[in-house]
Amino acid sequence: MSSAPLLQRTPGKKIALPTRVEPKVFFANERTFLSWLNFTVMLGGLGVGLLNFGDKIGRVSAGLFTFVAMGTMIYALVTYHWRAAAIRRRGSGPYDDRLGPTLLCFFLLVAVIINFILRLKYNDANTKL
């Protein structure tokens, strides 16, 4: 009989078991991607509306919003594929992204500020009392 206590850890082999990635992880990544695309379609719709029914300033703003929407679509696609590959490789890294939403907010803020500045400057030039 062994003299070692029963509950004591003994140095032994580690058994390598394949870890299973739950399907809900892939679906969550896909839902996030579709949410980003939903936002970009709305932003692109705003750009098209400004382009069709706006004046010269509206066309400038439409271009800005359309470029922000297209950039966001590309960002969402790259992020989706990066996360999907990391999930397939069972990467342990963080999957959150602080840079993308921050840049999106910054570019939207710039587009809105440019729209306001052009609108105020254009209206002040045409409405002299």
UniProtKB/Swiss-Prot annotation:
Residues exposed to the Vacuolar side: 54-59, 120-129
Location of the protein in the cell: Vacuole membrane; Cytoplasm, Cell cortex; Endoplasmic reticulum membrane; Cytoplasmic vesicle, Autophagosome membrane
Segments crossing the lipid bilayer: 33-53, 60-80, 99-119
UniProt-listed GO biological process terms: engulfment of target by autophagosome; microautophagy; polyphosphate biosynthetic process; polyphosphate metabolic process; vacuolar transport; vacuole fusion, non-autophagic
Positions carrying N-acetylserine: 2
A Gene Ontology molecular function term of the record: mRNA binding
Protein's UniProt keywords contain Transmembrane: yes
Stretches in topological domain Cytoplasmic: 2-32, 81-98
Pfam families noted in UniProt: DUF202
UniProt induction comment: By low phosphate.
Keyword check for Metal-binding: no
Keywords from the UniProt entry: Acetylation, Chaperone, Cytoplasm, Cytoplasmic vesicle, Endoplasmic reticulum, Membrane, Transmembrane, Transmembrane helix, Vacuole
Lineage: superkingdom: Eukaryota
Membrane topology term: Multi-pass membrane protein
This protein's GO CC annotations: autophagosome membrane; cell cortex; cytoplasmic vesicle; endoplasmic reticulum; endoplasmic reticulum membrane; fungal-type vacuole membrane; nuclear membrane; vacuolar membrane
Disulfide bonds: none
Function recorded in the entry: Accessory subunit of the vacuolar transporter chaperone (VTC) complex. The VTC complex acts as a vacuolar polyphosphate polymerase that catalyzes the synthesis of inorganic polyphosphate (polyP) via transfer of phosphate from ATP to a growing polyP chain, releasing ADP. VTC exposes its catalytic domain VTC4 to the cytosol, where the growing polyP chain winds through a tunnel-shaped pocket, integrating cytoplasmic polymer synthesis with polyP membrane translocation.
Subunit structure: The VTC core complex is an integral membrane heterooligomer composed of the catalytic subunit VTC4 and the accessory subunits VTC1, VTC2 and VTC3. The complex exists in 2 different sub-complexes: VTC1-VTC2-VCT4 and VCT1-VTC3-VTC4. The VCT1-VTC3-VTC4 subcomplex is mostly found on the vacuolar membrane. The VTC1-VTC2-VCT4 subcomplex is observed in the cell periphery, probably ER and nuclear envelope, but localizes to the vacuole under phosphate starvation. Each subunit contains 3 transmembrane helices. VTC1 is a small membrane protein without hydrophilic domain.
Entry similarity comment: Belongs to the VTC1 family.
Note: Present with 12074 molecules/cell in log phase SD medium.
Protein's UniProt name: Vacuolar transporter chaperone complex subunit 1
